[in-house]
Amino acid sequence: MLSPKRVKFRKQQRGRMRGIATRGNTIAFGQFALQAQECGWITSRQIEASRRAMTRYVKRGGRIWIRVFPDKPVTMRAAETRMGSGKGNPEFWVAVIKPGRILFEMGGPEITETIAREAMRLAQYKLPLKTKFLILNSQESETLVTPEV
């Protein structure tokens, strides 16, 4: 599973997820992509489960690019622990996702739209976010629209 080799600080605050993704929101490597529609955290286990689902369906047909990396530690305290006495230990790693972020890309000479769409659908089931399937040529028509608040 994905995790940083070393970090400057072991523990982080939770933070806030505001706005839309300004980086990593366009297709860069493949012809097809899975784009997040809402904000949230994706754990390294969920990324790995999605990757496995896609590679099993595609077999040796094409190439898959993972465009997110879990670099935020999530700490937890032991169950039935009293309040106080510091912050818990890092238990797992998450990637912070904003709307519009490209999560996975897929491409290759043997990958058709139907194969890519089905593989991305299988990966979508493993994720806790709403996502959208994108195609490189028609990306302008399927851009993310932000709701007026």
Curated annotation (Swiss-Prot):
Assigned keywords, A-Z: Organellar chromatophore, Plastid, Ribonucleoprotein, Ribosomal protein
GO biological process: mitochondrial translation
Primary subcellular site in the record, as a coarse category: plastid
Example of a GO cellular component annotation carried by this entry: organellar chromatophore
This protein's record includes keyword Ribonucleoprotein: yes
Classification via InterPro entries: Ribosomal_uL16 (IPR047873), Ribosomal_uL16_bact-type (IPR000114), Ribosomal_uL16_CS (IPR020798), Ribosomal_uL16_dom (IPR016180), Ribosomal_uL16_sf (IPR036920)
Recorded coiled-coil stretches: none
Subcellular location: Plastid, Organellar chromatophore
Keyword Plastid: yes
Listed Gene3D superfamilies: Ribosomal protein L10e/L16
Pfam families registered for this protein in UniProt: Ribosomal_L16 (PF00252)
One annotated GO molecular function: rRNA binding
Subunit record text: Part of the 50S ribosomal subunit.
Family according to the record: Belongs to the universal ribosomal protein uL16 family.
Record-given protein name: Large ribosomal subunit protein uL16c
Organism of provenance: Paulinella chromatophora
High-level lineage: Eukaryota, Sar, Rhizaria, Cercozoa, Imbricatea
